[in-house]
Design a protein with these regions (language model features):
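Conserved N-terminal beta1-alpha1 strand-loop-helix module at the mouth
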Residues: 1-188
Length: 188
């Protein structure tokens, strides 16, 4: 994903985003992540970069998210006692939701997990698990929660914003192993 949130160590400029987009292979969906950005800025990025999906990771209302005529997902910061299904229902026009850990004052990328039991509910659409995932815990997370996808950042970095190829490969291998085990258990 392309992070358009200047306060993030993973943030990219519009010029960097265009350079990245130019080398992305076919059938790979570019995701643009925004945090409480204004509509003009979001629209400007969408005009300049071939984004296939928007991820809203702030306090954006459903109507705001839906106005850009592009598939979108909404990140929900899960906190203790939260009714995850009810929060997801507010974003019923989204293509899905991303569940991340809540940490006051930080919209995401905290490296913290949340109480996964809160996500063990019937969610109304495809959902993505985020929040503190790494090579050590992602296999268990996928097997327990069976999300449509997982999202990782800090869990495969050597320092904020700097990815480690070895950690990425190990993370992908752990996800694949969980998927294979789930496929095997579904065949029985």
């Amino acid at each position: 994903g392309l992070v358009f949130y200047p306060e993030s160590p993973r943030s990219v400029s519009l010029a960097q985003a265009r350079e990245i987009a130019a080398v992305v292979p076919p059938f790979v969906t570019l995701v643009a992540l925004f945090v409480n950005e204004d509509a003009d800025t979001v629209s400007s990025v969408l005009r300049e970069v071939p984004v296939g999906l928007i991820q809203f990771h702030g306090d954006e209302a459903p109507g705001f998210c839906a106005q850009f005529q592009r598939p979108w997902i909404k990140a929900l910061r899960v906190r203790d006692g939260m009714d995850v299904a009810a929060e997801c229902a507010l974003y019923r026009d989204s293509s899905g939701v991303l569940l991340d850990a809540f940490q006051k004052g930080i919209p995401g990328g905290t490296g913290k997990t949340f109480d996964w039991r809160l996500a063990q509910v019937a969610l109304p659409r495809p959902w993505v698990l985020a929040g503190g995932l790494n090579t050590e815990n992602v296999k268990e997370a996928v097997k327990r929660l069976q999300p449509a996808a997982v999202d990782v950042s800090g869990g495969v970095e050597v320092s904020p914003g700097v990815k480690c190829p070895r950690k990425i490969n190990e993370f992908v291998a752990a996800v694949r192993a969980a998927d294979l085990e789930l496929d095997g258990s579904n065949d029985e």
